From Swiss-Prot:
This is 4-hydroxy-2-oxovalerate aldolase 5. Residues 9-261 form the Pyruvate carboxyltransferase domain. The lineage of its organism: Bacteria, Bacillati, Actinomycetota, Actinomycetes, Mycobacteriales. Substrate binds at residues 17-18, 171, 200, 291. GO terms for biological process: catabolic process; L-leucine biosynthetic process. The keyword Ribonucleoprotein does not apply. Signal peptide: none annotated. The keyword Nucleotide-binding does not apply.
């Protein structure tokens, strides 16, 4: 069953939300107007705008925003002529009044994210969003960490609370091919006609497009991506590449492939601080199953304490850290620094 009469699937571009991590949350109103204008003209149906960690994310722990996110949402709504504007919120970080304000500012899709075993904390937020007339989407973050049957049960909690589409969210970019299909299929089987299923991928193992296509084949009707891979870690599924692949496969997205390619190169790239690369740290994240937004934090702590960023991420993966535990990266870095100092002292003593 297609998403609608005109679209086989619906694509949401997260450049102005997930890309906030890569931009260190320094988006301006001008950035938003430029990117929304280009994506809207290319036919992208949904554009997500908030701090990288969602409503209320501007903080010492996650990083402070250059511009209040509600101002960015307003600018996006004012600029978009066809695209719907979505926002993300994490219960406990964002609060109910944030949802109301975003709705008042014209956003029409509320995306609520929880760790993939904690769907129950989203129930009241879905209820509020539906009462406000918002379309609702649920994110089961770090979906690689749980088997399909567990995710299906969590998806049921969200759907029963009023969520209209539940996403398998590969926050770490750690899922590989059939692991995506199995999880999406499990949600489709569980939810039936009660809610749609979506997929949010990252490029940390270089599989964003392939995983997204497999998700569609398994029944996903909504797919996330970011133009020019503008997202956390190695970035998200590149919308321009996904649009090209789906066009070749005869999957209707409503996106003009050539226009989105131009938008990626001419509009989005100049706003990025640098390309989102599949480098040592981002690849380590996918390999170790680490939350993608940890990348910049790990890199900063590695420089500050003179330790290996990759070792920080490997230990974060061993501890199975999740979003919200960024402070533990400092603890890990300090531990590595202490160990390095001790090893240096032993080596110097032996050589004396």
């Amino acid at each position: 069953m297609p998403y609608s009469a005109d679209l086989d699937i619906r694509v949401t571009d997260s450049s102005l939300r997930d890309g906030s991590h890569a931009k260190r949350h320094q988006f301006t109103v001008e950035h938003v107007r430029s990117i929304v204008g280009a994506l809207d003209a290319a036919g992208v149906p949904v554009i997500e705008v908030t701090h990288g960690d969602g409503l209320g994310g501007s903080s010492f722990n996650y990083g402070f925003s250059h511009t209040p996110e509600q101002e960015l949402i307003k600018a996006a709504v004012e600029t978009a002529e066809q695209a719907k504007i979505a926002f993300l919120m994490l219960p406990g970080l964002g609060v109910r009044s944030d949802i109301r304000e975003a709705a008042d500012n014209g956003a029409s899709i509320c995306r609520i994210a929880t760790h993939c075993t904690e769907a129950d904390i989203s129930v009241q937020h879905f209820g509020l969003a539906r009462d406000l007339g918002l379309e609702t989407v649920g994110f089961l973050m770090m979906s690689h960490s749980q088997p399909p049957e567990v995710l299906a049960k969590q998806a049921r909690i969200m759907a029963d609370a009023g969520c209209q589409c539940v996403y398998v969210v590969d926050s770490a970019g750690a899922l590989i091919l059939n692991a995506v299909s199995d999880r999406v299929s499990a949600l489709v089987a569980e939810l039936g006609d009660d809610a749609q299923v979506g997929f949010h991928g990252h490029e940390n193992l270089g599989l964003g497009v392939a995983n997204s296509v497999l998700a569609v084949e398994a029944g996903a009707l909504q797919i996330d991506g970011s133009t020019r891979r503008f997202g956390a870690g190695a970035g998200n599924t590149p919308v321009e590449a996904f649009a090209a692949v789906t066009e070749k496969l005869g999957i209707r997205t409503g996106i003009d492939t050539l226009k989105i390619i131009d938008a990626a190169e001419d509009v989005v790239r100049p706003i990025m601080d640098g390309d989102c690369l599949l480098d040592r740290l981002s690849l380590t994240m996918g390999y170790a199953g680490v939350y993608s937004s940890f990348l910049k934090h790990a890199d900063s702590h590695a420089s500050r304490y003179g330790v290996s960023g990759a070792e920080i991420l490997i230990e974060a993966g061993r501890r199975k850290l999740v979003g919200g535990q960024e402070d533990q990266l400092i603890e890990i870095a300090l531990g590595l620094a202490d160990r390095k100092s001790a090893e240096t002292a032993v080596a110097e003593k032996k050589s004396a």
